[in-house]
Amino acid sequence: MDLPEDQARFTNSYSLRTTSMETPREVSRSGRLYQSASRSQMAYSRPTMSIISRTSSWRTSPRPLPPPQVPSLMNSILTSRTQQSSPKLTNSASPNLRRKSSLGRLSMDRHGTTLQRTNSGFSTKETEMPRLLDRSESLSRY
């Protein structure tokens, strides 16, 4: 059951501090050192649950730092949907194994050109997560 939107709340706060300082030439050829520190907090709450995500990072560089990517609600939603989607399993041989499995499997076409055949025996398979029962379904039928 979804609650009305006026009972749910989302907050997103972000702060960034960048400083530039003079340093000895042994530390930085440019004579300057750039430091950046950022903090982010996103919170989503409803009467029945609360989710909080906090991140912090810092970087140091002898060159000016590029602007960081600011966390956004859309990035959070996309990350959440990606994690909920069904996993895709891929079984494939590494390039080294493929190369080894194809050695000695050369043949010629009708023009005398060498053909290389590979038959690694590996396949790609996609699976779905088992479907969850909702409350209206009963386990007694199983």
Swiss-Prot record:
Region of interest: Disordered: 1-142
Pfam families reported for this sequence: Luteo_Vpg
Low complexity compositional bias, start-end: 50-62
UniProt family annotation: Belongs to the luteoviruses movement protein family.
Keyword field contains Nucleotide-binding: no
Species in which this protein is naturally found: Bean leafroll virus
InterPro entries per the UniProt record, alphabetical: Luteo_VPG
GO BP of this protein: transport of virus in host, cell to cell
Designated name of the protein: Movement protein
Role this protein plays: Transports viral genome to neighboring plant cells directly through plasmosdesmata, without any budding. The movement protein allows efficient cell to cell propagation, by bypassing the host cell wall barrier.
Biased composition (Polar residues): 9-22, 33-43, 74-95, 113-124
UniProt KW keywords: Transport, Viral movement protein
Residue ranges, compositional bias (Basic and acidic residues): 125-142
